[in-house]
Amino acid sequence: MPTISQLVRKGRKSTAVKSTAPALKECPQKRGVCTVVKTTTPKKPNSALRKIARVRLTNGFEVTAYIGGVGHNLQEHSVVLIRGGRVKDLPGVRYHIVRGALDCAGVANRMQGRSKYGAKKPKQK
C-alpha cells in the first residue's frame, strides 16, 4: 500500500484496456478476401459443423471469421465485410462475417431477426 507522498510523486498507473478485436484497428468493420472456407467442430460439450472462413483483411491481417445463418454462398476469393464478435465454442474465432454485404448473400427465407442476417422484408400478398 503506497503512502500519500508516494502517490503524489508517482500517481496511480491506469491499466490499458485490451481490444477484443485487434485486427479491426478501432474500426467498426473491415473488408477482406476469403482465403479458405471450411467447417470446424466446436469445443465440448457442443457438437456441430460450424461454418468459418479465413479472411485476409485490407490492413494485412489474416483472421478467422464465423459465417452465421443457415446456408451461405462464400468461396475462395469472395470479398466479405467482417465485424467484431467472438464465437464462444470456437477457439480463435473472434470475428463475424456480415451477411448481405459485398459478396456474402443474406439468409434466404428468414422472417425474424432479418437485419442480423441481411434478409429483405418479404412481399405482402
Curated annotation (Swiss-Prot):
The processes (GO biological process) annotated in the record are:
translation
Per the record, residues carrying 3-methylthioaspartic acid are: 89
* Domain of life (superkingdom): Bacteria
Note the InterPro entries from the entry: NA-bd_OB-fold, Ribosomal_uS12, Ribosomal_uS12_bac
Instruction: Please give the PROSITE patterns that the UniProt record associates with this protein.
Output: RIBOSOMAL_S12
What GO cellular component term, any one, is given?
A: small ribosomal subunit
A Pfam family found in this protein is Ribosom_S12_S23
- UniProt keyword terms in alphabetical order: Methylation, Ribonucleoprotein, Ribosomal protein, RNA-binding, rRNA-binding, tRNA-binding
Q: What molecular function does GO assign, one term? A: rRNA binding
Quaternary structure? Part of the 30S ribosomal subunit. Contacts proteins S8 and S17. May interact with IF1 in the 30S initiation complex.
**By its UniProt entry, which NCBIfam families does this protein fall under?**
rpsL_bact
What's this protein's function?
Answer: With S4 and S5 plays an important role in translational accuracy.
Which family does the record claim for this protein?
A: Belongs to the universal ribosomal protein uS12 family.
What is the protein name given in its UniProt record? Small ribosomal subunit protein uS12
Q: Which gene encodes it?
A: rpsL
